[in-house]
C-alpha cells in the first residue's frame, strides 16, 4: 500500500470570527476544531501529518503537540502557497497526500478513508471531495463532462449562469499523488484579483497534463461545513452535539431531552445512566453505570462512580465514589475526593477535601482543605475554617465523629475518632479520641431585661 501523508491547513487568522482567539482554536464541544480534524486523521494509517500554522502558531502547536509536525506560513498568500510550505517535509516522497482544512471539525475518518480508497481505485493524480447542497452560493462548482469526468473547479464568482446552477461543490478536501502535487504547486500563479495562490488551480494544471482527476461525492454536506464566523461555529457545535448525544444513546445512556443536553466529545458515560435536561458534562468527565444526573447539574473533568445521583449541583475536577447522593445545590470544587455511600446535601461546598465512606454532610456546610474519616456526621452550618487571611491550613476529622450544628473548626486542627463536637462550638485546639469538644460561653438569662427595654419602644 502507498504511503499516506496529510496536510492540515491551519494558518488563517479568521477575521470574521472577531476574536482574540485564533480561528482553528475555537472549541467545538470541548475541543479546538483543528484538533478534531487531526484526531480523525490520526485514526487512519497515515505516516506523517503536517499542520501549516501561521497566526497563533505557538498555541496551535501546543494543542497538537505529539499529534503532528508543523510548518509555518509566514505570509498568508493562499491555500496553494500554504500547502507548498510542506515541501521540505513531503516533496519527493512516493505516496498520497490528504489536504484538509483545519476549520472543518465535522469531517470524519470514514469519509477520508473512502476518499483515499476511491483515489486509489481511479488511479488518479488528484481526487476532490465533493458534495451536493441545495444552495451552493459562494462555493466552487465541480464541472464534469457528459461522461461524468471532472473537467475543472470553477469558483462561484467566475461561474457562468449555467455553471452557477450546478449543485455539486468543492468541499476543500483533496487527495493527491504526493509528487504530482508538489510539482504542480510550483506552477500555480497568483494572477487573480486577490493576488493569492489557490489550491484548486492544481486541478487545472493536472488536467492540462492529461492526468486523471477524480471526484468522490459524499452524502452529507455537514461534514464539509467550514467555520468562518460565530454563526457557523454555533451550527458546527449543534451538529457535533447531535452526533455525540446520538452515540451515547446508542450505547445505552438515556438522554431525556437530547436537544437540551450538553456533552463534550471526550466525556464517557456508563450504561443505564439517565441524563436529565439542562445538564452540562465537560472535559474528560467519566460517569459510571446506573447514575442519575438531574437538571441543572454541571460536571467538568471529574470521575463519577456507579449509582450516583447528582441533583442540580456543580462538580469540578473531583472524584466521586459509588452510591453517593449529591445536592441539590452542592458545589464540589477541585480536588474533592468523595468516597462510597456519602451524602453531600443541599448548599454544601467542598474543596481539596477527602470525605470518607458513609459520611454525611447534609446541608449548609463548608469543608475546605479537610480530611474527614468514615461514618462522620457534620451538622448544619459547620465550617472548616481553613484560611487566616494569608495561609491555608488543614482540618482532620477522624472516624465516627459527630460535629454539632454551627461548629467552627479553626485549622490547623485535628478531631480524634469517635469524638463529639458540641453544637455552636468554635474549636481551636485538637480534640482527643472519644472526647467531647465544647467551646462556647455559658448561657446566662437576665430576668426581666427585655421587659425593661420595652422591646425598643
Curated annotation (Swiss-Prot):
A GO MF term: UDP-N-acetylglucosamine diphosphorylase activity
Q: Give the reaction(s) catalysed.
A: alpha-D-glucosamine 1-phosphate + acetyl-CoA = N-acetyl-alpha-D-glucosamine 1-phosphate + CoA + H(+); N-acetyl-alpha-D-glucosamine 1-phosphate + UTP + H(+) = UDP-N-acetyl-alpha-D-glucosamine + diphosphate
Q: Which InterPro entries match?
A: Bifunctional_GlmU, GlmU-like, GlmU_C_LbH, Hexapep, Hexapep_transf_CS, NTP_transferase_dom, Nucleotide-diphossugar_trans, Trimer_LpxA-like_sf
Disulfide bond positions: none
Q: Which CDD domains match?
A: GT2_GlmU_N_bac (cd02540), LbH_GlmU_C (cd03353)
Taxonomic superkingdom: Bacteria
Q: Where in the cell is it found?
A: Cytoplasm
Q: Which residues bind Mg(2+)?
A: 103, 228
* Biological role: Catalyzes the last two sequential reactions in the de novo biosynthetic pathway for UDP-N-acetylglucosamine (UDP-GlcNAc). The C-terminal domain catalyzes the transfer of acetyl group from acetyl coenzyme A to glucosamine-1-phosphate (GlcN-1-P) to produce N-acetylglucosamine-1-phosphate (GlcNAc-1-P), which is converted into UDP-GlcNAc by the transfer of uridine 5-monophosphate (from uridine 5-triphosphate), a reaction catalyzed by the N-terminal domain.
Q: What is this protein called?
A: Bifunctional protein GlmU
Q: What organism is this sequence from?
A: Listeria welshimeri serovar 6b (strain ATCC 35897 / DSM 20650 / CCUG 15529 / CIP 8149 / NCTC 11857 / SLCC 5334 / V8)
Amino acid at each position: 500500500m502507498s504511503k499516506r501523508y496529510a496536510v492540515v491547513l491551519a494558518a488563517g487568522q479568521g477575521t470574521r470570527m472577531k476574536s482574540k482567539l485564533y480561528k482553528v482554536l475555537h472549541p467545538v464541544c470541548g475541543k479546538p476544531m483543528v484538533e478534531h480534524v487531526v484526531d480523525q486523521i490520526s485514526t487512519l494509517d497515515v505516516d506523517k501529518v503536517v499542520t501549516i500554522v501561521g497566526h497563533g502558531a505557538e498555541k496551535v502547536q501546543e494543542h497538537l503537540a505529539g499529534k503532528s509536525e508543523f510548518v509555518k506560513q509566514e505570509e498568508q498568500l493562499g491555500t496553494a502557497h500554504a500547502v507548498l510550505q510542506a515541501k521540505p517535509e513531503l516533496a519527493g516522497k512516493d505516496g498520497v497526500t490528504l489536504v484538509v482544512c483545519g476549520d472543518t471539525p465535522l469531517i470524519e475518518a470514514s469519509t477520508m478513508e473512502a476518499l483515499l480508497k476511491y483515489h486509489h481505485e481511479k488511479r488518479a493524480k488528484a481526487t476532490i471531495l465533493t458534495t451536493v447542497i441545495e444552495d451552493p452560493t459562494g462555493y466552487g462548482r465541480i464541472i464534469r463532462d457528459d461522461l461524468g469526468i471532472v473537467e475543472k473547479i470553477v469558483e462561484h464568482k467566475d461561474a457562468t449562469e449555467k455553471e452557477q446552477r450546478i449543485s455539486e461543490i468543492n468541499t476543500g478536501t483533496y487527495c493527491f499523488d504526493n509528487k504530482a502535487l508538489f510539482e504542480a504547486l510550483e506552477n500555480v500563479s497568483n494572477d487573480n484579483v486577490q493576488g493569492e495562490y489557490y489550491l484548486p488551480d492544481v486541478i487545472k494544471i493536472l488536467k492540462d497534463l492529461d492526468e486523471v482527476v477524480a471526484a468522490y461525492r459524499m452524502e452529507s454536506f455537514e461534514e464539509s461545513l467550514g467555520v468562518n464566523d460565530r454563526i457557523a461555529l454555533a451550527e458546527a457545535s449543534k451538529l457535533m452535539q447531535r452526533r455525540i448525544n446520538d452515540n451515547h444513546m446508542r450505547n445505552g445512556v438515556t438522554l431525556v431531552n437530547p436537544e437540551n443536553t450538553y456533552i463534550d466529545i471526550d466525556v464517557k458515560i456508563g450504561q443505564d445512566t439517565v441524563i436529565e435536561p439542562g445538564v452540562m458534562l465537560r472535559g474528560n468527565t467519566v460517569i459510571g453505570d446506573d447514575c442519575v444526573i438531574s437538571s441543572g447539574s454541571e460536571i467538568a473533568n471529574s470521575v463519577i462512580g456507579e449509582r450516583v445521583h447528582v441533583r442540580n449541583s456543580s462538580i469540578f475536577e473531583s472524584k466521586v465514589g459509588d452510591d453517593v447522593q449529591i445536592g441539590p445545590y452542592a458545589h464540589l470544587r477541585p480536588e474533592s475526593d468523595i468516597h462510597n455511600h456519602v451524602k453531600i446535601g443541599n448548599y454544601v461546598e467542598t474543596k481539596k477535601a477527602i470525605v470518607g465512606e458513609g459520611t454525611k454532610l447534609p446541608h449548609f456546610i463548608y469543608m475546605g482543605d479537610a480530611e474527614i474519616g468514615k461514618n462522620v456526621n457534620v451538622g448544619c452550618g459547620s465550617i472548616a475554617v481553613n484560611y487566616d487571611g494569608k495561609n491555608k491550613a488543614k482540618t482532620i476529622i477522624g472516624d465516627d465523629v459527630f460535629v454539632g450544628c454551627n461548629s467552627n473548626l479553626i485549622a490547623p486542627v485535628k478531631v480524634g475518632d469517635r469524638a463529639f463536637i458540641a453544637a455552636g462550638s468554635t474549636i481551636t485546639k485538637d480534640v482527643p479520641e472519644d472526647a467531647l469538644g465544647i467551646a462556647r460561653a455559658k448561657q446566662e438569662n437576665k430576668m426581666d431585661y427585655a421587659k425593661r427595654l420595652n422591646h425598643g419602644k
